[in-house]
Amino acid sequence: MLNLEAIIETGEQVIQKISFNLQHISSVLNTEVFDPFDYCYYRGGNFWEIESAEDCSGDDEFIE
């Protein structure tokens, strides 16, 4: 006869482990994702790397 309590307990442990792994993956992705707009600006159809705060003059054109 099947021991349903043991099966349910094992299933709960597997779900907890999967949940932990997904949380870990999510936290790694949140810290490692590269956002080009943090380091570049768009002007004249090109992306330009920002090397210093002076590069951000605030007069960038906005094109949709």
UniProtKB/Swiss-Prot annotation:
InterPro entries the record matches: IBV_3B
Domain of life where this protein originates: Viruses
Pfam families: IBV_3B
Protein name listed in UniProt: Non-structural protein 3b
The organism of origin for this protein: Avian infectious bronchitis virus (strain M41)
